């Protein structure tokens, strides 16, 4: 006997997306945003309809992502940022708290809030993940957001 599997169609058409982007390491985060908007368009969405909110850095993403998710005209939020390791423990605090805060916001709002924050050792690694050889993690985050919206719709049917 075969189990019933929920297999939602991956289309952005009709999905109201918001993206919160950290301004810190802006050279990288702009590339993540570009990749995210391109992915949304590839999935059938209109990038002009995406709500984008710039925040000072990755530490501020959870609050803004939560507020965006609370809006009735938003189905999912993608949080984009870049935290690059330095010589102090600042990296661990920012990256860990951003991840934890975004998870809490997602569970509280019951809307997908996708972690698209790069955590790398060097600026070069960040560039690679923002459109270089390692792809664009902003695009991957949008694919995840759309899949989650469609999966939650399928579960609710």
From Swiss-Prot:
Pathway: Cofactor biosynthesis; riboflavin biosynthesis; riboflavin from 2-hydroxy-3-oxobutyl phosphate and 5-amino-6-(D-ribitylamino)uracil: step 1/2. One of its GO terms (biological process) is riboflavin biosynthetic process. SUPFAM superfamilies: Lumazine synthase. GO terms for cellular component: riboflavin synthase complex. The keyword Acetylation does not apply. 5-amino-6-(D-ribitylamino)uracil binds at residues 24, 58-60, 82-84, 115. Catalyzes the formation of 6,7-dimethyl-8-ribityllumazine by condensation of 5-amino-6-(D-ribitylamino)uracil with 3,4-dihydroxy-2-butanone 4-phosphate. This is the penultimate step in the biosynthesis of riboflavin. Belongs to the DMRL synthase family. This is 6,7-dimethyl-8-ribityllumazine synthase. It comes from Thermus thermophilus (strain ATCC 27634 / DSM 579 / HB8). The gene is ribH.
């Amino acid at each position: 006997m075969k189990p019933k599997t929920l297999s939602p169609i991956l289309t952005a058409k009709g999905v109201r997306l918001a993206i919160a982007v950290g301004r810190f390491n802006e050279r990288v985060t702009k590339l993540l945003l570009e990749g995210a908007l391109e992915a949304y368009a590839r999935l059938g969405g209109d990038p002009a309809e995406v709500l984008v909110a710039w925040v000072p850095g990755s530490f501020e993403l959870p609050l803004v992502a939560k507020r965006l998710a609370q809006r009735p005209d938003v189905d999912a939020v993608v949080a984009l940022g870049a935290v690059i390791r330095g010589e102090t423990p600042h990296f661990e605090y920012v990256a860990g708290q951003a991840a934890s805060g975004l998870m809490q916001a997602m569970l509280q709002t019951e809307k997908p809030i996708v972690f698209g924050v790069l955590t790398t050792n060097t600026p070069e690694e960040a560039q690679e993940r923002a459109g270089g050889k390692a792809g664009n993690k902003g695009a991957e985050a949008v694919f995840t957001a759309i899949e989650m919206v469609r999966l939650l719709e399928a579960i609710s049917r």
